[in-house]
C-alpha cells in the first residue's frame, strides 16, 4: 500500500510533499486518544529495547534524525509514529529562511535524498517556547547550528546563545558543525575551532552535549574529534551527517542537481566505518549515535553491535513509510532475544571483539 502511495507522492515536488505529509501526521496525532492508541501499536513496547543513556531513559533505540522536524512543531507526533525519541532542528540563534528553492531532491534509484536546505528555521527562541509548552512522551534532543550570517569568529557566541535558550528544555543537545549547506560550517570541525565552541556550550548548560560529525572527515580527523570529545567530557558523538561525495550513485542526472548533502544508502558504508573507528577509539567512554543509511532491522543491528547505543533515521522513514520504525524496533528485539541478550546495552559493541576490543 505504501509503495503505491509513495509512487504518487514522488510525482510531486519533494519539499511540498514534506510539508503536506508532516501536516497530515500532526493532524492524525493531534487527538490524545488516537495518539495513545498509535503509540501502543507502533511504539517500542518490548522492555529489552529500553535503555538509559547519559541519564535519559529511551524506550527504544531508533529516533527521528534532525532535519525532518526543524522547529519542533511535531513534538507530540513522534512517539505515536513509533520512534523511541526525536531530534529536532537544526535551529540557529536567529531565525533564517535557508537556501533558495529548489533545495530538496529525491534520488530514487539510490533510495536517497539530496538536500541543501541551509538550516531554515524559526530560531532557537521559538523552539524554546514550544518545548516549554509541550511534554512529549519520548525524549527530545535539539540540534543547534550556526546562523548563516554569523561570522566564523563569532560562532562561539552564536552556539552559546542557542544552548542558553533550548538547553534547559532539551533531553540532550547536539552541536552541528557538519552540515555541508552552510558556507564554512564544516571548517569548524577542526579541533582548534571546535574546542571553544564545545567548551562554551558545555559551560552554558548541564544538559548532555554531543557533537555531530561528517562522513567526509579523514580518519585522523575523526580520531582528533573523538579525543577532544573525551577530553572535554562530552556525552557523545552523532555519526554521521550527509555526504558531499557523489561516488557510486545510480540516479541519472545527479550532477545537474547542484550542491548539497546526500543521505540514505550512499552514506551507509562510510557511516558504519566511522562508527567502528569511534568505538575502537573511545569504547564506552562516549555514547555513540549512528545515523546514515539505516534502512532495515539488519542495518540497525549492525550499528548496535558495532558500538551504537542509539540510532537515527530520516531518509529510511521517507522511503519506508509509517511502519518503518516499528519494523526496525521489532527486528532489533528479535535479534536481542535470539542472541540471548538481556538488554540492549549488552549488545552494544558486541561485535567489536572480532576487530579488537576498544579501550575501557
From Swiss-Prot:
EC numbers for this chain = 1.3.5.2
- SUPFAM superfamilies (UniProt xref): FMN-linked oxidoreductases
- Entry keyword Chloroplast: no
Q: Which domain of life is it from?
A: Bacteria
Residues reported in the UniProt entry to bind substrate: 70, 115-119, 176, 181, 241-242
Q: What membrane topology is given?
A: Peripheral membrane protein
Pfam assignment, any one: DHO_dh
**Entry-linked NCBIfam families:** PRK05286.2-1, PRK05286.2-5, pyrD_sub2
Q: What is this protein called?
A: Dihydroorotate dehydrogenase (quinone)
Q: In the UniProt record, what gene is named as encoding this protein?
A: pyrD
Amino acid at each position: 500500500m505504501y509503495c503505491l502511495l509513495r509512487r504518487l507522492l514522488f510525482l510531486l515536488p519533494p519539499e511540498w510533499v514534506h510539508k503536506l505529509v508532516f501536516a497530515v501526521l500532526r493532524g492524525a496525532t493531534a487527538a490524545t486518544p488516537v495518539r495513545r492508541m498509535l503509540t501502543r501499536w507502533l511504539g517500542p513496547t518490548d522492555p529489552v529495547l529500553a535503555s538509559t543513556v547519559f541519564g535519559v531513559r529511551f524506550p527504544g533505540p531508533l529516533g527521528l534524525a534532525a532535519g525532518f522536524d526543524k522547529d519542533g512543531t511535531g513534538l507530540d507526533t513522534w512517539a505515536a509514529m513509533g520512534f523511541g525519541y526525536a531530534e529536532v532542528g537544526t535551529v540557529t540563534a536567529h531565525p533564517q529562511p535557508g537556501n533558495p528553492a529548489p533545495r530538496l531532491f529525491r534520488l530514487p534509484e539510490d533510495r536517497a535524498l539530496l538536500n541543501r536546505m541551509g538550516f531554515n528555521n524559526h530560531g532557537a527562541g521559538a523552539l524554546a517556547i514550544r518545548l516549554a509548552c509541550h511534554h512529549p512522551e519520548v525524549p527530545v534532543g535539539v540540534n543547534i547550528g550556526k546562523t548563516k550570517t554569523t561570522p566564523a569568529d563569532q560562532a562561539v557566541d552564536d552556539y552559546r546563545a542557542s544552548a542558553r535558550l533550548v538547553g534547559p528544555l532539551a533531553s540532550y543537545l547536539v552541536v552541528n558543525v557538519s552540515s555541508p549547506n552552510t558556507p564554512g560550517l564544516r571548517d569548524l570541525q577542526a579541533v582548534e575551532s571546535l574546542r571553544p565552541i564545545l567548551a562554551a556550550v558545555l559551560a552554558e548548560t548541564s544538559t548532555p552535549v554531543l557533537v555531530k560529525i561528517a562522513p567526509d572527515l579523514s580518519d585522523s580527523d575523526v580520531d582528533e574529534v573523538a579525543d577532544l570529545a573525551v577530553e572535554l567530557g562530552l556525552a557523545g558523538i552523532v555519526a554521521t551527517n550527509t555526504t558531499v561525495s557523489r561516488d557510486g550513485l545510480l540516479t541519472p542526472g545527479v550532477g545537474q542537481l547542484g550542491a548539497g548533502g546526500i543521505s540514505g544508502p550512499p552514506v551507509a558504508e562510510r557511516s558504519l566505518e566511522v562508527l567502528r573507528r569511534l568505538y575502537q577509539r573511545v569504547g564506552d567512554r562516549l555514547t555513540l549515535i549512528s545515523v546514515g543509511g539505516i534502512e532495515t532491522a539488519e542495518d540497525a543491528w549492525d550499528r548496535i553491535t558495532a558500538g551504537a547505543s542509539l540510532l537515527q533515521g530520516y531518509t529510511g522513514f521517507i522511503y519506508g513509510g509509517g511502519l518503518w520504525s516499528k519494523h526496525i524496533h521489532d527486528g532489533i528485539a528479535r535479534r536481542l532475544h535470539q542472541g540471548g541478550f538481556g538488554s540492549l546495552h549488552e549488545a552494544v559493541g558486541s561485535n567489536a571483539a572480532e576487530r579488537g576490543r576498544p579501550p575501557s
